Amino acid sequence: RLPDVQILKGNVRFRHDSVWMYCDSAYFFEKQNSLHAFGHVHLVQGDSIEGFGDILYYNGNTKLARFRNHVKLIHNEATTLTTDSLDYDRMRNIAYYFSGGMIEDSLNTLTSLWGQYTPDDNQALFKGEVQLEHPKFVLNADTLCYNTESYQADLVSKTRIVYEHETTILSSNGWYNTQTEHSMLLDRSLILHADGMTLTGDTIYYDKQAGYGKVYGNMQSVDSTNHMTLYGDKGEVWESDNHGYVTDSAMLVEWSDSLMNIYMHADTLFTDQIPYQRCDLIAKDSVLVDTVWQYPAPDTMWVDTTYLQIRAYYNVRVFCEDMQSVCDSVHYNGRDSVATLCGNPVCWSEDNQVSADTVKIYLKNGTVDYLHGIGNAIAVKQEGEREFDQMAGKEMLAYVQD
């Protein structure tokens, strides 16, 4: 027999304030205003909180309930916390575990070594080997804040979000709504796709379901398939339409297999992946336009699923090993590897210069093959300090040789 202790057995019930506690047996310490409950422990607080476990140590003065062994805490029948050891502070309405635990809601399952849950605001804090499992993705972090009502995860440490065989998101600051899959990613976060596309920037708003991203500050978008990188201060991408643009200090770098990089600067740059369409290239009973520029063509064309299209507007400058160019706008068509320069285009290579109303640059194997000047075409070559060779015409072809 223990002094100052009441021993109760069989369908034991306690009431303290608005809380009911049930168990198989208990030690009640009346002077200390505390109890030890054993076997099928069940705590009920109002109509929102229920706690279960094998053992409960409850202090009526501090209102601290310590559950041990096979512990489960249920909030509003929507959120369930499962662990082996749980302390529930009724005074502050905070529950926390410290030897590994799990919180489940209607959408996600979260596990960690240490965790804290606040029923008042549905907010949870996880630390140590944190993992969030969603039907579509898995999130891993060292520390994570999560709201079981809004399903929003606040990223406060290095975090990896993986959509298997599809997309990986790396961030250390921001938020990710696991229900809508909308996110705000800060501090140079990175989005990687399985097809080789990547997106990074100081701040990224990303809608995973819509495949849409908007970047503010030091944007960098890499297209490994087309060997191309876009830079700028801000821009947007639409993954489903394979469309994107970048503006404010915009630059495009094309790094082809030929190892010759092409640099393009402009106020604004647009890139698109255009679907190929099978079509007849030789029409029957056609009338030829009176021009000297006639080239043989195949009967039909079906090369690949898509081709690259680039558009650059205002104050365009292009630099590569073979040639440099300036103009007001550029349109590049990857289907036939032709770049069309408009708005006072000027192209030069060493001592040679070509200008016209419109200049078309034809590429071959990643290098410049020849130029086609259309309208007021002029070619100039410097032969001496004050000597120049000049040639002018309505149209002109200028070939680039090594």
Where are these regions (language model features)?
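N-terminal amphipathic/hydrophobic interface segments
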Residues: R1-D402
